[in-house]
Amino acid sequence: MDEKIAKLKEWIDGSDNIVFFGGAGVSTESGIPDFRSVDGLYNQQYKYPPETILSHTFFLSETEEFYRFYRAKMLALDAKPNAAHLKLAEWEREGKCRAVVTQNIDGLHQKAGSKEVLELHGSVLRNYCMRCRKPYPVEDIAKGTGIPRCSCGGIIKPDVVLYEEGLDSYTINKSVDYNSKADILIIGGTSLAVYPAAGLIDYYRGNKLVLVNKSPTPADRRADLVIHAPIGEVFSQL
């Protein structure tokens, strides 16, 4: 692994056009559970499967049950950025990293200092009234009970992409643009199992495709460099 990290460091040192594409594995080292690993959310037992609870239909029909799960399992407001988040913010300040494209909804990249963050699945930090669109901070959701309501009486919804909902087209198009122009594309902490997000790597045209993930992914065979290790552990050595 040392040789691979040395190679990655060499590439990074010589680049000013890095794009990072990350998933849940980036935040697990900050104590936020991922979805598909052995001890992830999908392998825990609930009254309903998480993918049912986190769906548009369930949100509308069982809003109180949705919020019970959401407050307990999706909000981690005390989580702190780890080595991966901090390194990416450092690269951005140095003019190396052009953008972070993330499937995560925890806001940790921004907390670490990254400015150009494209959140494919939204953010728990943003919430809005479904009737009048008034914005609400996440603290209002976290400290409340039951169904959060706006002063106008409307239901407040987190600005996250639920199952059955489409991704924001502006965010997708901007991500495609960054990926297609990148010198180095680093993919980290994702199983590349969720589409359309996982399909974004198809737009990369360079020859330095790097994959950093604890377990193998479907894209390993396409990558120019593959490191099977926790991403924070790898990035702390760069």
What name fits each language-model region?
Residues 1-238:
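Conserved catalytic core of sirtuin-type NAD+-dependent deacylases
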